């Protein structure tokens, strides 16, 4: 993440923390007050449009809650076990076929 993106992100978080609607003008105002000069105005517009109508505090509090994804993990592990058993059976069959051809070292 570039310095410009980081500065605009922090400005948006400051606005959300104060309960102020996030807009490009308000982001630019905060960046000006912080004396951040290297940010192009397009970044403020992009972030303002991306966050328009969204509750930033709710997004931040729900970042770590991935309940359904963790519930599906044991099912995937159970499905992998039969596949491993099939591979072992095939390997055993190949070993037996080598013995039938008389290529054993100690026959």
UniProtKB/Swiss-Prot annotation:
Source organism, top-level taxon: Eukaryota
Matching CDD domains: Ribosomal_P1 (cd05831)
InterPro entries, sorted: P1/P2_N_sf, Ribosomal_P1/P2
Keywords: Allergen, Cytoplasm, Ribonucleoprotein, Ribosomal protein
Compositional bias ranges of the Acidic residues kind: 90-101
Sequence segments annotated as region (Disordered): 68-107
GO molecular function, one term: ribonucleoprotein complex binding
Compartment(s) where it occurs, according to its Swiss-Prot or TrEMBL record: Cytoplasm
Sequence ranges of Low complexity compositional bias: 68-82
One GO biological process term: translational elongation
Keyword Ribosomal protein: yes
Gene3D superfamilies for this protein: 1.10.10.1410
Entry's Gene Ontology cellular component terms: cytosolic large ribosomal subunit
UniProt keyword Ribosomal protein present: yes
Family: Belongs to the eukaryotic ribosomal protein P1/P2 family.
Subunit structure: P1 and P2 exist as dimers at the large ribosomal subunit.
Function field: Plays an important role in the elongation step of protein synthesis.
HAMAP family to which the protein is assigned, alphabetical: Ribosomal_L12_arch
Protein name as annotated: Large ribosomal subunit protein P1
């Amino acid at each position: 993440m570039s310095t410009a993106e980081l500065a605009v992100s922090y400005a948006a978080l400051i606005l959300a923390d104060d309960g102020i609607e996030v807009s490009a003008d308000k982001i630019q105002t905060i960046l000006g007050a912080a004396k951040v000069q290297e940010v192009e105005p397009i970044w403020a517009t992009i972030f303002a449009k991306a966050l328009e109508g969204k509750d930033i505090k709710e997004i931040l509090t729900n970042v770590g809650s991935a309940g359904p994804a963790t519930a599906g993990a044991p099912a995937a592990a159970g499905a992998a076990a039969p596949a491993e058993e099939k591979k072992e059976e095939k390997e055993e069959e190949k070993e037996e076929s080598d013995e039938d051809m008389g290529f054993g070292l100690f026959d």
